[in-house]
Design a protein with these regions (language model features):
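Residues forming the flavin
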Residues: 1-140
Length: 140
């Protein structure tokens, strides 16, 4: 993932603490691919690109990545996060302007376990979007 400094990419525990080395490996592959794409594009400055901000809401401590470039979305977006408390039988809800984009049931959530939610990019096409919120919600 590209940092706020153009051309500097970070992954693994430098970015945020991971529970599984598998996720570090997956993230490092992505960071390497993005770094290669950056170099092959002639080190194009992306600071003026349109972005989607990710915002932690009710029960969520943080989300990675914090920004997604609209013109560089892959087939699937993976948001990594940790919850603030221990929860049972809840939903992770991703919203755009109050409208639910995705909802995933979880039996157990704990701050010590990194969570992730995968969102198909096709769900974001043809809608006005500049912010995705993620929150813990009561299961219905």
């Amino acid at each position: 993932m590209e940092t706020e400094v153009p051309g500097i990419f970070a992954c693994g525990n430098v970015l945020h603490v991971h529970d599984l080395v598998d996720w570090v490996t997956e993230e490092s592959r992505k960071a390497g691919a993005y770094a290669a794409e950056y170099v092959l594009s002639g080190c194009k400055d992306s600071s003026s690109d349109e972005v989607i901000h990710t915002v932690a809401k009710n029960g969520i401590s943080y989300i990675v990545p914090q920004r997604l470039r609209k013109d560089n979305l892959q087939e699937e977006i993976i948001l990594y996060f940790r919850v603030r408390d221990i929860y049972y039988d809840r939903k992770i809800v991703v919203k755009n302007k109050g409208e639910v984009i995705k909802s995933v049931k979880r039996r157990h959530l704990a701050p010590g376990e990194m969570e992730q939610v995968k969102i198909k990019t096709e769900l974001l096409r043809n809608i006005d979007i500049d912010e995705l919120t993620v929150e813990v919600s009561e299961e219905v």
